Amino acid sequence: MEAMLPLFEPKGRVLLVDGHHLAYRTFFALKGLTTSRGEPVQAVYGFAKSLLKALKEDGYKAVFVVFDAKAPSFRHEAYEAYKAGRAPTPEDFPRQLALIKELVDLLGFTRLEVPGYEADDVLATLAKKAEKEGYEVRILTADRDLYQLVSDRVAVLHPEGHLITPEWLWEKYGLRPEQWVDFRALVGDPSDNLPGVKGIGEKTALKLLKEWGSLENLLKNLDRVKPENVREKIKAHLEDLRLSLELSRVRTDLPLEVDLAQGREPDREGLRAFLERLEFGSLLHEFGLLEAPAPLEEAPWPPPEGAFVGFVLSRPEPMWAELKALAACRDGRVHRAADPLAGLKDLKEVRGLLAKDLAVLASREGLDLVPGDDPMLLAYLLDPSNTTPEGVARRYGGEWTEDAAHRALLSERLHRNLLKRLEGEEKLLWLYHEVEKPLSRVLAHMEATGVRLDVAYLQALSLELAEEIRRLEEEVFRLAGHPFNLNSRDQLERVLFDELRLPALGKTQKTGKRSTSAAVLEALREAHPIVEKILQHRELTKLKNTYVDPLPSLVHPRTGRLHTRFNQTATATGRLSSSDPNLQNIPVRTPLGQRIRRAFVAEAGWALVALDYSQIELRVLAHLSGDENLIRVFQEGKDIHTQTASWMFGVPPEAVDPLMRRAAKTVNFGVLYGMSAHRLSQELAIPYEEAVAFIERYFQSFPKVRAWIEKTLEEGRKRGYVETLFGRRRYVPDLNARVKSVREAAERMAFNMPVQGTAADLMKLAMVKLFPRLREMGARMLLQVHDELLLEAPQARAEEVAALAKEAMEKAYPLAVPLEVEVGMGEDWLSAKG
């Protein structure tokens, strides 16, 4: 076993930890960190990391961790408004504080809380006691109040790593430690509601103390203090100044009975269980609780069937990567392939982290290697924030290294540990075995197959766009009255707001400069003709630089096709995403976006078949909510937007005009994403009150939709997560947040995820069921983008393939409403979409 950190080596140094302050600081610094059960743990993790950082730098004879007691301190009795301005304690904090105290006890540290006194006073008393007994002292805190304690033997250790010593204090502020409390009394402290002297800031306070040496001497010579306005401020606030001085000075004389030389051994097993419970896998190693890796038991290649595989690629994209190393592990025995590529021929299945990638590379080499168990997929189902092998290894106990054998061992261990965590989770296990694992085989085949690209067409389109971009630039320069760099936001800002005097509608968060974002320009579209031209220029430039020019270079020289990567563990809802290139971001509705789709073509003698789920999210909403009106519309095959408009506006369906239908369509989809009345009023260019009425009439038309949303949010608050029809989860801890904007954002996420995630699950199910039948027919599955599937089939069988695929998608899973799929065929993606 690796030894624990040398916490108690007799080096004559004591560590005092400002527990409450450190916990609060890390609570806000790492907000959003939760376990796979949705339990917030950011303060616990940050506290542990800060402790480790301090302990690694120096050995300590003893460690004391001090917390504020629940009872009010003497300062509250002296000054009723003390700390009155502080925000209420965040609701997640008390539970995490209890966990931090549990951690401190397990580490064997002395934990102190003294009723009637703050942690500062306890720390100060301990520091003076330790100093008097001949110890060196480090106080781990970022609280500036404790700077008054620094001396030759006492230093404040900031969590970021630097020491506050008398020398540091003099260099930074020109103050001696005994002057620090006078300085704090003069300037006050808004965080503690200490008044200080109103109108005196740090610069003036430092100048006064430099001149008079101390607050006591300054007050003795108050009539000689210059300038006059400073003197008058002090006189006007003398009572506040004396109160601030009294409250700022820490007590060093508390009657504490502690033995500085006493130290307890940590509870190793309890600590291990604690860290595993909170999924702090990386901390097991840092606290020395992982068994030292035993020498690997080597065995000859090939490995036995069922072994877990580890591999190392030269780059992330498997179609372009070199296989640098290959190893396998079964029951702790390691098998290394001397020749990685040759070793692939001995495998039938890839079990291990990122199994799909190795299957894709094998396919490139002409080998049919099937991806099997992948701990990444298990971790992703436990918590969709598990998106990388590095993160999964850290979270569940392990390390992602560049060694293929260790990756194989890690895969075996993670698979075992994650299956144990999923015991009893029948829905998640069903998703793993019936959806995600078989889907990885489908995606591996799709990635390896790729799609043909019309490179000559894209090159011609690039020239055309370059000319159009040049023409737009000239038009913008003419309207501006002079040329400038259109790609420089600062120059564009000057032209729009200084020269053309357009209204500045917002500022950037980082710099505070007037924003030239797309949202701002959209709002200014009607204000001046130049804005329309700039927006057009941006769209053309972005699509040219993102797709038209780079796509030809991504065509693989060996296959002559484009091979995007499908990311199975990247989104919070369960949807697939794509990268290298990202095909999800090609605009579907703009003319230029459609022209880019024209570049994706079928092989000679083949046809592309495009299949698109029609209004799948609204159909899923009908099923999940059980709303009879919504269900009836889809069962009777009526147009949902026309029917919604009919109910919203109180007119027969035949009387619904295009504007009414557009309003209803916006509300139908807006409800899914929690669109506010304010946003709806902007979208439809209608008064706010009318938008409120639209939304209310929608919920009157579909009453069970509102009931379902409320039920989903209520369950989410209780359980900490929401789930799809099939049990896929998303943890939403902020559903209980006190801050309204944070809570409302979480609510939008919470009721959208079951709909969007169920739609994603249905698409995945359809792909898994359809894939083997397509292979039997000699057809290929190429792309999955949004709610669409793109296939390639021999022309002679294209109609047969289209009919088969349509049926498979529509019958993916029985719902209360029929699923409907729109089908098209053509020589390229655009014409196949019709």
Swiss-Prot record:
GO annotation terms (biological process): DNA-templated DNA replication; double-strand break repair
Catalytic activity: DNA(n) + a 2'-deoxyribonucleoside 5'-triphosphate = DNA(n+1) + diphosphate
Entry keyword set: DNA damage, DNA repair, DNA replication, DNA-binding, DNA-directed DNA polymerase, Exonuclease, Hydrolase, Nuclease, Nucleotidyltransferase, Transferase
Top-rank EC class of the record's enzyme: transferase
Alphabetical list of SUPFAM superfamilies matching this protein: 5' to 3' exonuclease, C-terminal subdomain (SSF47807), DNA/RNA polymerases (SSF56672), PIN domain-like (SSF88723), Ribonuclease H-like (SSF53098)
Biological role: In addition to polymerase activity, this DNA polymerase exhibits 5'-3' exonuclease activity.
Name of the gene encoding the protein in the UniProt record: polA
The species this protein was found in: Thermus thermophilus (strain ATCC 27634 / DSM 579 / HB8)
Residue numbers spanned by region Polymerase: 412-834
Domain 5'-3' exonuclease, residue spans: 176-262
EC number: 2.7.7.7
Single Gene Ontology MF annotation: DNA-directed DNA polymerase activity
CDD domains, sorted: DNA_pol_A_pol_I_C (cd08637), H3TH_53EXO (cd09898), PIN_53EXO (cd09859)
Entry similarity comment: Belongs to the DNA polymerase type-A family.
Protein name, as recorded: DNA polymerase I, thermostable
